[in-house]
Amino acid sequence: MGTPKPRILPWLVSQLDLGQLEGVAWVNKSRTRFRIPWKHGLRQDAQQEDFGIFQAWAEATGAYVPGRDKPDLPTWKRNFRSALNRKEGLRLAEDRSKDPHDPHKIYEFVNSGVGDFSQPDTSPDTNGGGSTSDTQEDILDELLGNMVLAPLPDPGPPSLAVAPEPCPQPLRSPSLDNPTPFPNLGPSENPLKRLLVPGEEWEFEVTAFYRGRQVFQQTISCPEGLRLVGSEVGDRTLPGWPVTLPDPGMSLTDRGVMSYVRHVLSCLGGGLALWRAGQWLWAQRLGHCHTYWAVSEELLPNSGHGPDGEVPKDKEGGVFDLGPFIVDLITFTEGSGRSPRYALWFCVGESWPQDQPWTKRLVMVKVVPTCLRALVEMARVGGASSLENTVDLHISNSHPLSLTSDQYKAYLQDLVEGMDFQGPGES
């Protein structure tokens, strides 16, 4: 017979009295209120000590045995939170988890004194019929409490060093006519984690504009990403699938504008490379054309403001982080934020159109990761939790999925808790 699982409240009181876990402490003399560190895993300054209470509970319940099991900080945190939320007589008094300097939560005993929990009690910890908070966080816990989440392989640092194998061009999206039912995915697999798996090919929709006129659109999928070039005859040893922008003579009539556009295209040289590594999209300029970029709306670039940056030459630069996008998407699904932006706009060969209409620029290119568009569309049509919708991730080895709104939100939360928050200059 195995060791009985301890009850969360007596165990927690004993940890508070010991005072050995970083940031876990009583906050009043009557010992009715206590604080728990609640730093999000996305924060750059997150340390293992910030998750000490969650690991201790995982060890106490037998969910984690050091040396045998792999550490899983997001799951520890989720299970601890779920155990607290089920407890009658305990309430969340203050939620300071968004505090930039000291994120934490303060809980309070309301129906019984601490003395009731002062002695260790190893009777089974059952769910009981206690009141449960109706926050989205608790709904996610109920959905994810019994899941076994496999860690992702280390994607390694971004690199442009290896020439790609030939990629089929273009690749069509899988049909939505026969979506794969959700149960076929397996009980422990979060399908959204495929977005981060090394080797999974993101699909990019590339649209080019000459003086505001759309002249080109193509959907590309290649493990090494893509490379915008201005000539069919390019350096095939460079990485990324070459996407050749069309000659302006095919769509423009003004000879002067045609001449300027051709000059810009000729200066692209090796091209503008864009690829994914981990949760980041990276870009690098391989030619002479200065290129500015911004993350904006699909319909038009954010021309009323300055660019987000300039694509660096001869080194990679981060242009999109999936982590904040997913955080904003979760907020959007909860109705408390705007739809996150995901379209990358590039102004090639000229300064960013900050004070002028973007249609005056010679060459503007929009790149949309179609998987991100699909995630936003799923959030928009989610509606009631009982409503099933279909989402197509538009990445390799994936098929359309039928998910309820609650399943979708739960998978988003699980995805973001497993991410790292890295600056674009870090690997």
UniProtKB/Swiss-Prot annotation:
Effect the entry attributes to changing residue 396 to E: Phosphomimetic mutant; interacts with CREBBP
SUPFAM superfamilies: SMAD/FHA domain (SSF49879), Winged helix' DNA-binding domain (SSF46785)
Documented activity regulation: In the absence of viral infection, maintained as a monomer in an autoinhibited state. Phosphorylation by TBK1 and IKBKE disrupts this autoinhibition leading to the liberation of the DNA-binding and dimerization activities and its nuclear localization where it can activate type I IFN and ISG genes. Phosphorylation and activation follow the following steps: innate adapter proteins, such as MAVS, STING1 or TICAM1, are first activated by viral RNA, cytosolic DNA and bacterial lipopolysaccharide (LPS), respectively, leading to activation of the kinases TBK1 and IKBKE.
Residues carrying N6-acetyllysine: 366
Outcome recorded upon mutating residue 227 to Q: No effect on IFNB induction upon Sendai virus infection
Reported effect, residue 360 to R: Highly diminished ISGylation
Major location (coarse): cytoplasm
Region of interest: Mediates interaction with ZDHHC11: 141-427
Keywords, ordered alphabetically: Acetylation, Activator, Antiviral defense, Cytoplasm, Disease variant, Disulfide bond, DNA-binding, Host-virus interaction, Immunity, Innate immunity, Isopeptide bond, Mitochondrion, Nucleus, Phosphoprotein, Transcription, Transcription regulation, Ubl conjugation
Result of altering residue 285 to Q: In IIAE7; loss of viral infection-induced phosphorylation at S-386; loss of viral infection-induced homodimerization; loss of viral infection-induced transcription factor activity; unable to activate interferon transcription in response to viral infection; decreased IFNB induction upon Sendai virus infection
Residue list for modification Diphosphoserine: 386
Biological processes annotated in GO: antiviral innate immune response; apoptotic process; cellular response to exogenous dsRNA; cellular response to virus; cGAS/STING signaling pathway; cytoplasmic pattern recognition receptor signaling pathway; defense response to virus; DNA damage response
Record PTM (Microbial infection) Phosphoserine, positions in chain: 175
Effect on the protein upon substituting residue 285 to S: Abolished interaction with STING1, MAVS or TICAM1
Protein name, as recorded: Interferon regulatory factor 3
Upper lineage: Eukaryota, Metazoa, Chordata, Craniata, Vertebrata
